[in-house]
């Protein structure tokens, strides 16, 4: 467990030292988490599974909430004040990260910075920017793709945030490779 836990915790905290507030630190930690897991390993999620194998997992019934009825695994990533969750689906190029508490504005700013740092051969395409209210709780959804000419496979990054302090999740990102046929 220490093989993955120590590097992951270092990655989560390396930039946090410079954060001006707890909200910024939480957003920075969340951003570091999905950058160092979902984005970094999107082309080889089996390698990410191997790195996560020693972290605790959610029981199947609780993991189902994060897996949208798909088969996969949800790992608990220790973090204060609350742990993060990393989810990988078994049969899809799909990785997601969840934060119970995070500053929506900071998470969105850091997400946009990450989207605009796509490798130079990719074109960045914004595909969604919507706000909706469900049961009195407002959420904001942003979606971007990194596209290559003549390539049907497109890394897609969907961020959803909420400013509602009662929301079960204030930030989550889904990172998946989709094809033109999907």
Segments predicted by a language model, with ranges:
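Bacterial N-terminal signal peptides
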Residues: 7-15
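Glycine-rich, aromatic-bearing surface loops/beta-hairpins
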Residues: 137-182
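Long, charged/polar, surface-exposed segments that mediate recognition or autoinhibition
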Residues: 79-141
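N-terminal leader/targeting segments
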Residues: 20-85
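Broad, structure-driven detector of short, well-ordered beta-strand segments within folded domains
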Residues: 74, 82-89, 153-163
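Positively charged n-region of N-terminal signal peptides that target proteins for export
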Residues: 1-4
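Processing junctions and N-termini across compartments
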Residues: 13, 31-32, 89
């Amino acid at each position: 467990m220490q093989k993955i836990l120590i590097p992951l915790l270092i990655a989560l905290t390396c930039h946090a030292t410079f954060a001006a507030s707890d909200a910024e630190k939480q957003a920075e930690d969340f951003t570091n988490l999905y950058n160092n897991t979902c984005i970094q390993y999107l082309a080889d999620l089996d390698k990410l599974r191997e790195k996560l194998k020693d972290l605790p997992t959610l029981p199947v019934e609780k993991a189902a909430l994060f897996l949208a009825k798909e088969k996969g695994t949800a790992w608990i990533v220790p973090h204060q004040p609350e742990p993060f969750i990393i989810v990988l689906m078994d049969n899809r190029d799909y990785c997601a990260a969840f934060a119970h508490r995070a500053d929506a504005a900071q998470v969105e700013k850091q997400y946009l910075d990450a989207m605009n740092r796509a490798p130079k051969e990719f074109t960045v395409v914004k595909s969604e920017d919507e706000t909706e209210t469900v049961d009195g709780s407002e959420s904001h959804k942003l979606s971007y793709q990194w596209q290559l000419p003549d390539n049907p496979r497109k890394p897609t990054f969907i961020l959803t945030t909420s400013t509602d302090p009662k929301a079960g999740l204030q930030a989550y990102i889904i990172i998946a490779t989709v094809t033109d046929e999907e």
